[in-house]
Amino acid sequence: MAKQVSPGVLALRKVVDDVHKEAREAKARGELVGWSSSKFPCELAAAFDLHVMYPENQAAGIAANRYGELMCQAAEDLGYDNDICGYARISLAYAAGVRVSRKYDPETGEYIIDPSTGKPLKDADGNVVMGEDGKPKKDPKTQTPYLQLDNLLEIEKLPDGPEKEKRLEAISPIRQMRIPQPDFVLCCNNICNCMTKWYENIARMCNIPLIMIDIPYNNTVDVHDENVKYVRAQFDKAIKQLEELTGKKF
């Protein structure tokens, strides 16, 4: 019997699927789509009706789908040290256009199946079907192709045609591999210091605006007025940047 998924989990999946779908559709319409750190004040983006995706969540999803090692290695091949966190490495590789892709035969277009994948094939009575070699047969419906890395930015430069179509199709269909490239980035570094350079690198790599909220370290119970003024001034600057980016008034 298949495992039952709770209504709450199904509802949350729909919320996430809808957010991803809306971002892809917005990008296709030519609207701005940004990437945001999880602690950036989301109300600012919402006030300007901006579509925002979250690289930290994306990186966790990529890792949960067992693509983390491939993406981390890709980031290291780009020159990033393996001492920085896996979230950052996965995101930086993705920002550079790296995508996990299903391997296929260029001549036939058929995907090349990894024999180590797939669930045991079962008969109508639910019994595992055994092969002549004495091992369980694999259900072909659950087998998956070998994985390789491709680069979306290189694919997009190709002329329209079968090769371009196939390479786009071969990119892993999980939603975390289909997040649009960013038009701007929103960063707040009150989680960790890595955030600052992570998002600066995305902005530099993609040649897009970075809107930054730098949170000063507070080592006392009380919050000093100077710190409040410092953060408030950055909110004012962020609003001005978003006005210039969108052409809208706050």
Model-derived features: positions:
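An N-terminal assembly and electron-transfer interface module characteristic of large anaerobic redox
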Residues: 1-250
